[in-house]
């Protein structure tokens, strides 16, 4: 990256500390030294570098040669000169622009957003897995036999108040996160260890299931023979391969859908060629070549580059500020560094000659030289381009008495559209230019500007100034706005053609020359000369300023071609600070070396923009789908804020905790209006149609609960032993949990319970399992009764399933004493689907082979012409001043 090394910054700080120390020392020696001869003594043409050691040597030599009085005088003179020189050096150092410190973390987050297809699929998507469960005898003892059932692979319900609907919403979210863009079965296939002829099955989980079934003593011989025959079937002429898989019917439906709706598309050279931004393809400064012909099996996933459907620039100040900040940091990392700048020392010396500072006694013109250094110039160049690329608002820092800064500011306001500056800063700068340079030149009274005036100072001045050239320049600045142009479907903010070709600088120079010829009738002659000399310094570099303007425009437009999201211009909450002394540095130190972005930098910038934009759209699609699902699951109010928070977290760059609530809810409202993407909708429908099967396979979700005032005996069950479970609801009066929750009318159920009538609440609800006999004796099941009778709530209902068998603690209490345990509740739970090998064996079909390429620009080799020969849009060299 193009940032200065940290070591260099430390060295600068050390030097600064040394100079401060030296300044303090010299002040202690002589506090009352006169400062009237600053311009004479400090900026003499002869350069001296004085260190502490040299100072001591010089002083000791002079003392030896002279008597005591002379030595005292000489010591004072040397110290005075030394102090003045150090003071000016320190002032210059203080006025330099500090090196821009990149927020490395934001840049890394942006660059780490990779396209999803980079995650290689190694297994099929599964919700279910077959599990071997024991069988229990009538007395609760475990048999040696086992039976296979389909159970949930991830059977997790978080603790606390939790609704089964939320489980399904989380399951849907999990499916969306894992939903593959493509499936290539050949890549995930593994060897079937039990195969006779080294056949393969579709994935490692299928192989593990086959192994477990093959080794199970109760497996039929026919099934073992079938497993030994399981292998892939290849149809090479059709580029198709079939793999055997063991899947639950619902999982088979999911994977079948993924295979049918893959997002991969054929890839060829034309697609790669058209993927490169058109303006870079057509830019004569870049030489692009395709390295190779692609095979017929090459595939790619088209990035999702829909324009911003949420309009984040509209009423989302915090979010917009974060996006523009991250774009600004990214843009700064790709703006090229200026090369071969004019030597700072040589330029300051030349400027001091032009100003004839040694002949002057006024102090104002020494300020012209403060803050001029190459680091500030480079920093200013990068700030201007990066701020325009990211549409970050800038604020200006300046000192009104530094006329050189204000004259440089006139160039800045000429080439950068007014919208880029925060209004308060723009008004302050324009007012300073009017009252310091323009109005005094014509002998006009100071402008008294009213805060809140809809017109800017330049707009007021344009109407009052009679001079044609000055009024013409003011008119240009007042109407200098970005042109909004849609290129390749992206809204671009384009600069005025007069700025792009640099002609506007001539217009500025005409206005400046007119100002320098005026008499400044109300001002002293020294004031007039100072302004004239400042204008002279800038006008001496007319050619370089034209080149600088063209260079700025070219780099901005070339990098702008790599932006994929609409460039919306809205003032940002925070601003990027720009000091006018750094603009002076840029104007005074710009050389004649052309710098243009390298092709690798452009491709990197383009890829990062595409990846962020594509990820942004995919996350929007996910959030819209989750909101729709939450609505259909009646969780709309409960889950909404967390859905929006998850959406922002997955965009990587946001600090979600700091986003104001009003913007969260506005974001929710905008997401709610968007249509659901068809693939995501189909996936939700698959889950919604099979909710009962998923509930049955869970060890934590029941289909209802039976409540009685009197104890009910625990029953024997093959799957659990002694258990308070009901497999059907025959003979019980049923109340729907959904309706009870909706109506809030608990009178019916309370009356039934108090009249000793058992009642069945039907609906999916979570339950917990307890296998301790002691806990069954120790407590009544208040978890249900209290919720119903006292709290009048069913949304936090969580019954306990008591499971007593030979695996339980203290089982001997039941076995030895023929005790019949009882409970006041029964959990209504249907039997999970039994695993049937024949019904679970599916053949899945996919392409035999294809290769997905995620980085299309890797096939393009690119180079540039010699920078000195680089041309702008008008087919003339960018930098003409050689």
UniProtKB/Swiss-Prot annotation:
Region (Hydrophobic), start-end ranges: 396-416, 424-444
- Is Cell membrane among this UniProt entry's keywords? no
Do you know which InterPro entries this protein is assigned to? Rotavirus_VP2
Q: One Gene Ontology cellular component annotation?
A: viral inner capsid
Q: Which UniProt keywords apply?
A: Capsid protein, Inner capsid protein, Repeat, RNA-binding, T=2 icosahedral capsid protein, Ubl conjugation, Virion
Which cysteines link up through disulfide bonds? none
The protein's assembly and partners? Homodecamer; each decamer is made up of two conformers of VP2, called VP2A and VP2B. Interacts with a VP1-VP3 complex. Interacts with the intermediate capsid protein VP6. Interacts with NSP5. Interacts (via N-terminus) with NSP2.
HAMAP family in UniProt = Rota_VP2, Rota_VP2_A
Its biological purpose is as follows: Inner capsid protein that self-assembles to form an icosahedral capsid with a T=2 symmetry, which consists of 120 copies of VP2, with channels at each of its five-fold vertices. This capsid constitutes the innermost concentric layer of the viral mature particle. It encapsidates the polymerase VP1, the capping enzyme VP3 and the genomic dsRNA, thereby defining the core.
Q: What is known of its domains?
A: The N-terminus binds RNA. It is necessary for encapsidation of VP1 and VP3. The N-termini of 10 VP2 molecules form a cylindrical hub underneath each 5-fold axis of the inner capsid.
User: What is this protein's record name?
Assistant: Inner capsid protein VP2
Organism for this UniProt entry: Rotavirus A (strain RVA/SA11-Ramig/G3P[X])
């Amino acid at each position: 990256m193009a940032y200065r090394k940290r070591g260099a910054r430390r060295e600068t700080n050390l030097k600064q500390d040394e100079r401060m120390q030296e300044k303090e020392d010299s002040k202690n020696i002589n506090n009352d030294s006169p400062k009237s001869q600053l311009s004479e003594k400090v900026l003499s043409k002869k350069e001296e570098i004085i260190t502490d050691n040299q100072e001591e040597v010089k002083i000791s030599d002079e003392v030896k040669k002279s008597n005591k009085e002379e030595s005292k005088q000489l010591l004072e003179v040397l110290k005075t000169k030394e102090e003045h020189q150090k003071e000016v050096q320190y002032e210059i150092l203080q006025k330099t622009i500090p090196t821009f410190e990149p927020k490395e973390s934001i840049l890394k987050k942006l660059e780490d957003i990779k396209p999803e297809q980079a995650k290689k699929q190694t297994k099929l998507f599964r919700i279910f897995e077959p599990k071997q469960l024991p069988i229990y005898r009538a007395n609760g003892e475990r048999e040696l036999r086992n039976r296979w059932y389909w159970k949930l692979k991830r059977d997790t319900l978080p603790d606390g108040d939790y609704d089964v609907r939320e489980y399904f919403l989380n399951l849907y979210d999990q499916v969306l996160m894992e939903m593959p863009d493509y499936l290539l079965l050949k890549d995930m296939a593994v060897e079937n260890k039990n195969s006779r002829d080294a056949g393969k099955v579709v994935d490692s989980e299928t192989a593990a299931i086959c192994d477990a079934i093959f080794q199970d003593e109760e497996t039929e011989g026919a099934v073992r023979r079938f497993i030994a025959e399981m292998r892939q079937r290849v149809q090479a002429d059709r580029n198709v391969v079939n793999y055997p898989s063991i899947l639950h019917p619902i999982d088979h439906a999911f994977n079948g859908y993924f295979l049918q709706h893959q997002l991969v598309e054929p890839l060829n050279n034309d697609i790669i060629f058209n993927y490169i931004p058109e303006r870079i393809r057509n830019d004569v400064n870049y030489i692009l070549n395709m390295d190779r012909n692609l095979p017929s099996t090459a595939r790619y996933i088209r990035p999702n580059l829909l324009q911003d459907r949420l309009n984040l620039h509209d009423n989302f100040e915090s979010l917009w500020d974060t996006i523009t900040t991250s774009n600004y940091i990214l843009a700064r990392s790709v703006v090229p560094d200026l090369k071969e700048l004019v030597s700072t020392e040589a330029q300051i010396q030349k400027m001091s000659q032009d100003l004839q500072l040694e002949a002057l006694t006024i102090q104002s013109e020494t300020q012209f030289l403060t803050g001029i250094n190459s680091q500030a110039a480079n920093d200013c160049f990068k700030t201007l381009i990066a701020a325009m690329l990211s549409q970050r608002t800038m604020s200006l820092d300046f000192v009104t008495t530094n006329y050189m800064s204000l004259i440089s500011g006139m160039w800045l306001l000429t080439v950068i559209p007014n919208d880029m500056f925060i209004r308060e800063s723009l008004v302050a700068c324009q007012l300073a230019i009017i009252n310091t340079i323009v109005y005094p030149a014509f002998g006009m009274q100071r402008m008294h500007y009213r805060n809140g005036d809809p017109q800017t100072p330049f707009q007021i001045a344009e109407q009052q100034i009679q001079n044609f050239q000055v009024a013409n320049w003011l008119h240009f600045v007042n109407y200098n706005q970005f042109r909004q142009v849609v290129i390749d479907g992206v809204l671009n903010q384009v600069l005025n053609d007069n700025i792009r070709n640099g002609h506007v600088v001539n217009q500025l120079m005409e206005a400046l020359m007119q100002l320098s010829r005026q008499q400044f009738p109300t001002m002293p002659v020294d004031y007039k000369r100072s302004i004239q000399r400042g204008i002279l310094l800038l006008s001496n570099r007319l050619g370089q300023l034209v080149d600088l303007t063209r260079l700025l425009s070219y780099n901005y437009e070339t990098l702008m071609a790599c932006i994929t999201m609409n460039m919306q211009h809205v003032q940002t909450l925070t601003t990027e600070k720009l000091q006018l002394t750094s603009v002076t540095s840029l104007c005074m130190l710009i050389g004649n070396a052309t710098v243009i972005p390298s092709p690798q930098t452009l491709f990197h910038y383009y890829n990062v923009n595409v990846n962020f934009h594509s990820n942004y759209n995919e996350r929007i699609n996910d959030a819209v789908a989750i909101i729709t699902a939450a609505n259909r699951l009646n969780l709309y109010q409960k889950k909404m804020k967390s859905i929006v928070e998850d959406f922002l977290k997955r965009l990587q760059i946001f600090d979600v905790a700091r986003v104001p609530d009003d913007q969260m809810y506005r974001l929710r409202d905008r997401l709610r209006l968007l249509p659901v993407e068809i693939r995501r909708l189909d996936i939700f429908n698959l889950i919604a149609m099979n909710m009962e099967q998923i509930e049955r396979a869970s060890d934590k979700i029941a289909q209802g609960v039976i409540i009685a005032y009197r104890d009910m005996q625990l029953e024997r069950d093959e799957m659990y032993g002694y258990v308070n479970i009901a497999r059907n609801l025959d003979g019980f009066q049923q109340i729907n949990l959904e309706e009870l929750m909706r109506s809030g009318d608990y009178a019916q159920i309370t009356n039934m319970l108090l009249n000793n009538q058992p009642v069945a609440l039907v609906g999916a609800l979570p339950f917990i399992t307890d296998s301790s006999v002691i806990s069954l004796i120790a407590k009544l099941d208040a978890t249900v009764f209290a919720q119903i009778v006292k709290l009048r709530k069913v949304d936090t209902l969580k019954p306990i399933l008591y499971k007593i068998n030979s695996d339980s603690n203290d089982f001997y209490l039941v076995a030895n004493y023929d005790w019949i345990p009882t409970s006041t509740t029964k959990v209504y739970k249907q039997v999970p689907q039994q695993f049937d090998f024949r019904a679970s064996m599916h053949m899945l079909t996919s392409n035999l082979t294809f290769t997905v390429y995620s980085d299309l620009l890797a096939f393009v080799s690119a180079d540039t012409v010699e920078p000195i020969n680089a041309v702008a849009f008008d087919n003339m060299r960018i930098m003409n001043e050689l």
